[in-house]
C-alpha cells in the first residue's frame, strides 16, 4: 500500500469504493472488511524462532494500487459526443432504468463482440449487492444490475481476466468505476497490461449517489416492516430522503 494512497485518499474519506486497487494488488494484501469505507492492508507476520515479526507487505512493490486509483487524478470534464434517449427492445423490455444497458450488453454478447460482463447484481435472498461475471445473454437479461446500493464492482474482475481468460470484457459500474478504468488504461506499467487488453467496453450509469447496503435493513426491514423476500426491485424516488436514511423505497 502506498503512503500516498493512505494519505491522499483513505485518510480523507475520498475512496471511490470501486475496488480496483484490491483487484490489481500484485501481493493480494488489500482487502475489504465489513463496515469499512475503504480497503485495508492485511497484517502479516513471520515466525523466526520464537519471535513473531511483522512484515511490511508493501516493500519493493510496484504500487499498482496507485496506478489504478481514480481519486489520485484530477479529471477534466469530457465533452459529450452524442446525447440521445433510448428504450430497450427485444429480450430486455420492461422499462426499468438499467434495461438499455442490458440490451446493449445482450447485443454485444450475442454478436460475439463481448465474452462476458463484470457487473453488479442483487442477491434475491439477502438483498445484498454482489459483483459477478455473466457470460451468456440469458444471464445478462436476468441480472438486476446496479440497484443504488454500493459494492466494489471490480471484486469480480480477476475472475473474468484470469479464471475465465476473457479477452473482450465489458464493465458496468458507477462513473467512479469508469474513471478507474480510464486511469488503468493510461498506465504504462506492464503488470496492468492483462487488464488493459481484456477490458473492451466500459459503461457508467447515471449516478446521483449510491448508498450502503445497510440501508436495506434500516429502511425496509426496521422502519417499513417489509421482509426481504417481498422485494423484487429497489427504486430510489427521493434521493435526499434516502441519503438521510428516510428513503422512499418501493417493494414490488
Q: How would you describe each model-predicted region?
A:
Residues 10, 20-43, 51-54, 58, ...:
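Iron-sulfur cluster-binding cysteine motifs and their immediate structural context
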Residues 5-7, 50-51, 90:
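A short, structure-level motif marking secondary-structure boundaries and short turns
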Residues 1-13, 120-125:
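Small-residue-rich anion-binding loops in enzyme active sites
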Residues 70-252:
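Iron-sulfur-associated redox domains of electron-transfer enzymes in respiratory
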Residues 4, 14, 58, 97:
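Charged, low-complexity surface patches
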Residues 46:
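DHp/HisKA histidine-phosphotransfer helix
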Residues 14-17, 21, 30, 61, ...:
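General structural feature for long, well-ordered alpha-helical segments within catalytic domains
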Residues 5-24, 103:
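N-terminal basic/disordered segments at the start of proteins
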Amino acid at each position: 500500500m502506498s503512503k500516498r494512497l493512505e494519505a491522499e485518499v483513505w485518510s480523507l474519506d475520498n475512496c471511490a469504493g470501486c475496488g480496483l486497487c484490491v483487484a490489481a494488488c500484485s501481493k493480494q494484501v488489500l482487502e475489504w472488511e465489513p463496515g469499512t469505507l475503504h480497503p485495508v492492508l492485511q497484517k502479516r507476520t513471520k515466525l523466526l524462532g520464537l519471535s513473531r515479526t511483522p512484515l511490511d507487505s508493501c516493500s519493493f512493490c510496484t504500487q499498482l494500487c496507485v496506478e489504478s486509483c481514480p481519486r489520485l487524478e484530477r479529471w477534466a470534464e469530457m465533452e459529450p459526443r452524442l446525447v440521445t434517449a433510448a428504450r430497450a427492445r427485444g429480450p430486455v423490455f420492461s422499462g426499468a432504468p438499467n434495461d438499455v444497458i442490458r440490451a446493449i450488453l445482450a447485443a454485444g454478447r450475442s454478436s460475439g463482440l463481448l465474452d462476458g460482463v463484470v457487473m453488479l447484481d442483487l442477491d434475491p435472498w439477502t438483498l445484498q449487492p454482489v459483483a459477478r461475471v455473466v457470460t451468456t445473454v440469458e444471464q445478462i437479461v436476468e441480472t438486476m444490475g446496479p440497484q443504488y446500493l454500493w459494492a466494489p464492482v471490480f471484486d469480480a474482475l480477476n475472475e473474468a481476466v484470469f479464471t475465465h481468460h476473457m479477452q473482450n470484457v465489458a464493465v458496468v459500474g458507477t462513473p467512479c468505476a469508469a474513471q478507474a478504468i480510464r486511469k488503468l488504461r493510461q498506465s504504462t506499467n506492464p503488470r496492468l497490461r492483462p487488464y488493459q487488453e481484456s477490458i473492451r467496453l466500459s459503461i457508467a450509469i447515471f449516478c446521483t449517489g449510491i448508498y450502503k447496503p445497510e440501508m436495506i435493513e434500516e429502511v425496509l426491514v426496521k422502519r417499513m416492516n417489509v421482509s426481504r423476500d417481498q422485494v423484487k426491485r429497489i427504486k430510489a424516488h427521493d434521493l435526499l430522503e434516502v441519503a438521510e436514511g428516510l428513503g422512499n423505497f418501493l417493494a414490488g
